[in-house]
Amino acid sequence: LHIREGAQNEKTFNSNPMTYLKSIKEIISRGGYVFRVGDKKMTKMPKIKGLIDYPFTEFKSEFMDVFLGATCRFGIGTSSGYWTVPVYFGKPVLLVNYLPILDYYSLGEKNIFLGKHLKNKVTGEKISIEKLFNFNIGYFTCDDQFADNNIEIVDNDENEIWESTVEILNLLDNGKTQQEFTALNLKFKEKIDLQNEKIFDFPI
């Protein structure tokens, strides 16, 4: 588990670690252990049996950073680079509170992607999935870009993160369901590709 906590001027990519506690407890309740990775600048997690706040242990090292990503059952990541470690070693990942949206295309079909919500500040309405995957909004990466377009960023809440965690756990426990999910993921990508081809008038 890696939860990005950067400087205050980088709030676009940050997440509140406390909104992950319900998911952590879900994993532990199913017999798993959760290793929270990162560095000592991060917020300390509450003491929970089965949760290892790894950055604050004597075992913290670059080797262990890679080892944990390589040997985990799956990884939970945010808008930071660590999630690429488990992916490199063929492990599935759940990305939550993620921006930019179009990074979804860098994932394989067995992974789950839950981007941050984007709302129109003028109307108060959520921006549709179709618009999220357009080539302008989908590549926004800084607060100014969102502000200039009257877009508010809303983090996933703890229940959304928990529901996604339950989903990936169930997928890992049920091979048939995982095959169905992979097919749905491919179909979704095809639909978005067709939509963007209409906009740009060339194959994506």
Regions found by a protein language model. Give the residues of each.
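A donor-sugar binding/catalytic signature common to diverse glycosyltransferases
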Residues: 65-111
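Well-ordered, non-membrane alpha-helical segments in soluble/globular domains
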Residues: 15-22, 69, 162-163
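Catalytic donor nucleotide-activated moiety binding site of glycosyltransferases and closely related
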Residues: 1-7, 17-61, 180-191
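Surface-exposed cleft-lining segments at the edges of enzyme active sites
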Residues: 8-12
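Intrinsically disordered or highly flexible coil/loop and linker segments, enriched in small
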Residues: 33, 81, 174-178
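Leloir-type glycosyltransferase catalytic cores
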Residues: 109-204
